[in-house]
Amino acid sequence: GLTGSFWLALLGSLIGAAIAGVLIEIIIIRRLYRRDHLDQVLATFALILLLSEGVRWIFGAFPLYLNIPNILNGSIPLFFEIIYSKYRLFIILIGLLIAIGLYLLITKTRLGIRIRAGQNDRQMISALGVDISKLYTIVFAIGAGLAGLAGAMIGAIQSVEVGMGEPILILAFVVIVIGGIGSIKGAFIGSILVGVTDTIGRVFLPNLLKVFMEPANATSMGSSIGSMLIYILMALILIMKPSGLFGKN
């Protein structure tokens, strides 16, 4: 980058993604609100493909890397003699702060009240004088900005490249289905359940299977089964609660 500053990169990604989100919402998504949800989903998938190929054509497909700042480099001792990366702890902390901030925004502010009302009955809130289009644009900007921030933070662990968010897309849908559509609490609990289930499956299953088979086969099979556990969890929750853990009936 021009400055090499990690913190400016985070800020720039947040602002840049929010601006892009506003433009996409105004130009494309706003025209689809009165249509079926499937049309909206298909349109956003088409946008993913178009934007990915556009970025690849303009900037190339070479991955870019962010340097972790010195203050977040290295590891820190935790309980039970566990050594953990400072930067990963930083990501966890930022995630928790964002979750708390979103919860307070939705439940404790006038904007949050309008967002919830607009979700339930857009005609009613429009009749009360609230500009529902502006409200949706704000929501889209917040979501896009947070997505950009997340991409920048993960770029210091992996790399920033075209399609880096696509593997997360399916997991995001799983989190929403498990937690319940429209629930901030559900999204938070669902993301924790998915993360813990995936980690336990990938870490403990291979070690357990090594007791019964060759280490190489155990590692491969354990990782595969670990990935399946997320979808098994989703299926079980949907059987018991079709609307998700905190979704509306």
Model feature map: region roles:
Residues 3-4, 34-35, 108, 119, ...:
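Helix-loop interface residues and adjacent transmembrane-helix termini in multi-pass membrane transporters
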Residues 3-15, 137-147, 151-231:
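Transmembrane alpha-helical segments in multi-pass inner-membrane proteins
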Residues 4-47, 54, 189-194, 198, ...:
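Alpha-helical transmembrane segments within multi-pass membrane transporters and channels
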Residues 14-20, 47-55, 94-103, 144-147, ...:
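Hydrophobic core segments of alpha-helical transmembrane domains in multi-pass membrane transport
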Residues 31-32, 37-108, 135, 203, ...:
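Transmembrane helix-bundle core of multi-pass membrane transporters
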Residues 31-35, 118, 152, 176, ...:
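Amphipathic alpha-helical segments that mediate coupling or scaffolding at interfaces
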Residues 81-164, 184-189:
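Helix-loop-helix "hairpin" substructures at the membrane interface of multi-pass membrane proteins
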Residues 243-249:
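Short, charged juxtamembrane terminal tails flanking transmembrane helices
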